[in-house]
Amino acid sequence: MRFPFLRIVVLLLVTCVMSFFSFGQKTNNTWKSLFNGRDLSNWDTWLRATNMTGYSDDEMIGPPQPPIGLNNDPLNVFTVKDGILRISGEIWGAITTKEEYGNYHLRFVTKWGDKKYFPKDTLPRDAGVLFHCTGNFDYAFKCWMRSMEMQIQEGEIGDFFNVGGGVAEFQVKEKVKTIYNETADQYDPSQPLVRHPGRVWRSGNFESPKGEWTTSEMVARHADAVFIVNGFVVNRLFNIFRKDLNEQVTRGKLQFQSESAEHFYKKIEIRPISFVQSRPVLVANQKEYTLSALQNQQIEITNKGEAVEIIAAELIGKEIDSVVIKLPPMPMVLKKGSKIVLPATIKQGTTPGNVVTFRLETVLGPVSDFQINLITK
């Protein structure tokens, strides 16, 4: 049987297996920092022309101007102070890794500033992380490479956008109204896989309040990817394919956008993922929990099988961002015989009678044969 949320990959070469971390064991899960907290010596910068005005390669104020270009930042769009990277957003562009990456787990911590710039000074603050980036720096709107995007936008961190990097498969609920009254297809793992060329809205809003730091993650696994916000899976895509090249897209550089909004990063780090599988057997002390805004429920989960590394949780159903579950620091290794207890409640005003499915995530996808139902009261 095919499970779209977990593609099993067997590596036959032992030398390849040994080059990755095993998520089924307690391993040295060392992260490599991509941002050293001092400068951008590990990055390239690119900025387009100062008088370009929006999502057009031709829309300019006045006569055409050349781009500011590569590793030239006269307006200090990208600056580092006290271990924090500031991206002003004043000119569209990006910082770009010098290396390409594939089969990785990316983690970054960000928060919004106050400043916004034309042409998006009246719109929600916006940025993004582009992955599997290839080609010229100025492919899209004279400022970004061919890529796929994990959107970083107020209230919508974890949206997917296609920036010319190929077409992927998604599970979506069609024509949903977003928080900004737009119409978009929304990630919904209860739906069948379809090939989708454009935007896919995140499943729920798990961001921190403005002014606080949000931890976002991406697992890029071959031609698939998973987006995670503050410990919760919010989007998932499969089989990224470039028709013009007749091949899957599995690796590339990373870009962090400047797109009209001031924002900050205090951590950007990456680690390789492991394809070594374990056989955990996770059992909850109840199959269903009734959640109330008046008191916490305690979700108790015991591992009766092999050790497994958990990187996130996922909620499936309606109003999932009204369910409040306190997760432990991730990633965490759940050993055989050990258990975790997760306090769970709901926000005031949540619609009663909703059934929300809860499951746990590894770098290879959801833990097999484990899910529980949460019923709102």
Which residues does each PLM region occupy?
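Bacterial Sec-dependent N-terminal signal peptides
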Residues: 1-27
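Carbohydrate-interacting regions of secretory-pathway proteins
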Residues: 25-281, 343, 357, 364-371
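Short strand-edge motifs at loop-to-beta-strand transitions and within beta-strands
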Residues: 214, 297, 338-344
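Beta-sheet-dominated interaction scaffolds and their linkers
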Residues: 276-305
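Short, solvent-exposed loop/turn segments enriched in Ser/Thr/Gly
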Residues: 292-299, 347-357
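Surface-exposed binding patches on compact interaction domains or structured appendages
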Residues: 306-341
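Short beta-strand edge segments in extracellular beta-sheet folds
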Residues: 373-377
